Amino acid sequence: MTLPVASCERHASNPLLGSSGTFLPVKGWSFFMATVTYDSASRIYPGSDKPAVDKLDLDIADGEFMVLVGPSGCGKSTSLRMLAGLEEINDGAVRIGDRDVTHLPPKDRDIAMVFQNYALYPHMSVAENMGFALKMQGVSKEQRLQKVREAAQLLGLEEFLDRKPKALSGGQRQRVAMGRAIVREPKVFLMDEPLSNLDAKLRVSTRTQIAALQRRLGITTVYVTHDQTEAMTMGDRVAVLKDGLLQQNDTPLNLYDKPNNVFVAGFIGSPAMNLLDGKVTESGVDVGGYVVPLQPAVRSRLGQDAAATVGIRPEAFRIVSNEENGLPVEVAVVEELGADAYLYGLVGNGDEQKEIIARIDARRPPEKGAKVKLAADTERIHVFSASTGDRLTD
């Protein structure tokens, strides 16, 4: 299951949606279907012993929108550049469709890239920028103009074709950069943090337009971002990387509900999942006096008195009475956001205190400094190995 992008982030200004909110039909475009395969692909930079990308195995289906996400230095942009032919592959292979492109130059890979920097020629009009690559390929002026007009109509840029880039907004410039890629009719779109230069409001509307465009064209797309919200709202699947290693490749919903390890659990979700240290007992995992039920098979595998990490998302908590089984929390602050509120509190004592976040009913928030008990929905509690960080619960 993928998260509904266009339906949940629909904007009246989106030129890719009709008045009913459905995608407008695409005419005049003939994109070739293509899979993308990373086959144990590695990249080691000269002078470094540690791979920037370490044996990446990833299969991307025809027409799929795949997002690579992770913190700075995780290898996501390097992975994209390996596919583009801008980085050498030291081991393994990369294929587009059935063709091994590992050693092909970028111009022979039939891909188109959109960067964080739009790289538009300031002295050229929008139409000239969009058609420049076709001009370099020797495409006739008549054919170029036809493709440019079709792409401009697709992107809502028709009235801007005669303008220079300096007369456009950041979002419009980004659409021009996308139009320049579209007119080439490549097999694969590669996008490297294309929204990083936009303000917060424009990023939301532009990411909706990009996702809607990709679904209309049906072109295989690999998209890189450090923003997990972008990843979750745009991708059919999301590949999470850390230190050059693939941590999990799954649908946005599965990443959220069943993270493979502690890193994915803490990285995906806003606010982040609460990760608490616990100790295995006969009854479950004891977290500061709050006993979390544990599956018998998992408990026997860990053994009595073993350490474990318990993960609980903020929305899984509820405030309970002092007589119930719950986690004692001292309220530090409550952020009221209308229908919901977030409680930021402290658990533990002295130097071992840890911050915890819970989503609560905004109509009955506790006061700062109050002591409350929080309990979690047992079906939404995650348990991870304290030694490896791997997920233990189903």
Where are these regions (language model features)?
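Non-catalytic connector elements of ABC transporters
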Residues: 271-273, 280-394
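Conserved coupling/switch loops of ABC nucleotide-binding domains, chiefly the family-specific signature
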Residues: 90-93, 143, 243, 381
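Conserved ABC transporter NBD signature motif
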Residues: 92-100
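The feature captures the beta-strand-to-loop junction immediately N-terminal to the Walker
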Residues: 69-71
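Helix-to-loop junction immediately C-terminal to a conserved catalytic motif
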Residues: 84
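ABC ATPase nucleotide-binding domain
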Residues: 37, 59, 95, 373-375
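ABC ATPase nucleotide-binding domains
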Residues: 106-263
